[in-house]
Amino acid sequence: MSSHPSTRRDRYDCFGDTASAVGRAAAILAGLQQVPADHTAVAAEIAMLADRSADTPDTATADRRLGRVLHSVLTRLRTSAEHANRHCVTSLADELAEVVGIIEECGRHTARQFAAPFDPTWAAWYRAEILRLADDADDAFRRLFARWYFDTDDLSAVAGMRELSEELEEVVRAFEAVAEAVPAIFADQPTELPR
């Protein structure tokens, strides 16, 4: 009898700690929604979390891609927090607060996906949910870009928000990459519908 499925399961499970860190970092970033936001604390907490999660497990090729994109999410979350701190962001534009909430939800789903039993059906659900949330984020970005120059005469504040928004968009793209990489772990695996 082949041990391939259990081996793949073990390889999948080895990313649980990183996925959990992604979920925690996204929840910490959500602190930017508060008014006033403690941008210094948010940046410091995410930096510590990212430093503790720096190692990528040594796994098969498809799995290495998953490891890379999970760590990319952490890196992008860290950079977003650094931008918010650099520009002393204490109050987000409404659309960016919405995006930060979407990112928090993506992080929560990611942590749950890797904490759940090994099941390709749930991987497909996860992918669909992340892509749906990414569409919601894109809509928020479009609304922001359509109006934000009319909201303030403070060009430095606009520049800071633009830099932060660009990095938050990269966070969303990184979550999309995770969503696309997860199903590869289940290639050639029979699908078991949840009971």
Predicted regions and their residues:
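Cytosolic, long alpha-helical scaffolding segments
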Residues: 1-195
